[in-house]
């Protein structure tokens, strides 16, 4: 193995692992959540990248993410057309059709709900471990 081969990793199904502020049972009902990068995969990683394959069979989709904030920035990326979602940023609610990206600055309270459609959601959170990124008491 070369010096840098350790930086090439394969995703794995997050399956039944917990994810703070997320209802995993409901998420699993929408489709699998795959971990593409975290410190379990690459010890030096300072990003957590998840891809959620989503298929809302009966609109509107269920709520599965509690309002929360991180001490670091986050981005939700919906790269393909086919999903309508609602994102709450602070006290503002926005309904958005994919493709779209939502940048969430550090400490901004937020949540996301998939209203209808099918496709993928990419979540990118800065920090070594997702749990370490959560803000205790964030305004906004």
Give residue spans per PLM region.
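Short, surface-exposed beta-strand/loop "edge" segments at domain boundaries and coil↔beta transitions
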Residues: 58-59, 95, 130-134
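A short beta-strand-loop-beta hairpin characteristic of the jelly-roll/cupin
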Residues: 72-98, 135-137
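Short acidic (Asp/Glu) patches
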Residues: 61-62, 89, 105-108
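Short histidine-centered beta-strand/loop micro-motifs
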Residues: 61-71, 87, 113-114
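A short, N-terminal "cap"/entry segment at the start of jelly-roll beta-barrel domains
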Residues: 1-61, 65
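Ordered hydrophobic segments in well-structured contexts
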Residues: 35, 48-53, 74-78, 101-103, ...
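Double-stranded beta-helix
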Residues: 1-18, 115-140
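Conserved metal-binding segment of the jelly-roll/cupin
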Residues: 96-117
């Amino acid at each position: 193995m070369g010096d840098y081969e350790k930086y090439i990793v394969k995703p794995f199904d997050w399956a039944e692992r917990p994810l703070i502020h997320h209802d995993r049972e409901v998420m699993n009902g929408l489709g699998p959540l795959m971990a593409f990068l975290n410190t379990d995969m690459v010890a030096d990683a300072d990003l957590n990248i998840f891809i959620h394959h989503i298929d809302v069979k009966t609109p509107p989709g269920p709520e599965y993410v509690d309002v929360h904030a991180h001490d670091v920035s986050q981005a939700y990326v919906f790269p393909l057309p086919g999903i309508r979602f609602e994102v709450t940023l602070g006290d503002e609610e926005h309904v958005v059709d994919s493709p779209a990206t939502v940048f969430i600055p550090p400490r901004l309270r937020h949540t996301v709900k998939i209203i209808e459609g099918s496709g993928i959601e990419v979540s990118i959170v800065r920090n070594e471990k997702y749990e370490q990124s959560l803000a205790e008491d964030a305004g906004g």
